């Protein structure tokens, strides 16, 4: 019987990526094969832990400096919203985060089907 393949799809951020590494390591200790779908900006993180990576662009490709500026501006622009109640954040921070999640899903649809066909996972784990 061959090992079950678990495909990890962490958000393109170190917290979710490293969380997936820990879960993937535990899976491999139990005889599973772990593979990771990663965004270009996180490429190399999972390989550094010995996992097979499959890059799927989650946004329009841009130089690292431009991507860093985008996220810095996004967070800095929302700092005042973090003083608001969760309810008051719905029309600003929550809405913009949701729109970003939808945009990443649209971008992922361009390459993700090919990765899923190549990997043929038995289980998919998503960390958003």
Where are these regions (language model features)?
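Glycosyltransferase specificity loop/lid
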Residues: 1-128
């Amino acid at each position: 019987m061959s090992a079950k393949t678990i495909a990890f799809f962490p958000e393109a951020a170190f917290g979710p990526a490293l969380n997936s590494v820990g879960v993937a390591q535990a899976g491999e200790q139990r005889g599973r094969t772990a593979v990771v779908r990663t965004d270009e900006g996180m490429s190399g993180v999972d390989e550094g832990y010995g996992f097979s990576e499959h890059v799927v662009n989650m946004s329009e490709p841009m130089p690292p400096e431009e991507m860093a500026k985008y996220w810095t501006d996004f967070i800095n622009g929302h700092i005042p919203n973090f003083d608001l109640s969760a309810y008051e954040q719905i029309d600003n921070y929550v809405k913009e985060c949701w729109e970003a999640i939808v945009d990443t899903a649209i971008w992922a649809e361009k390459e993700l089907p090919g990765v899923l066909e190549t990997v043929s996972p038995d289980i998919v784990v998503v960390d958003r």
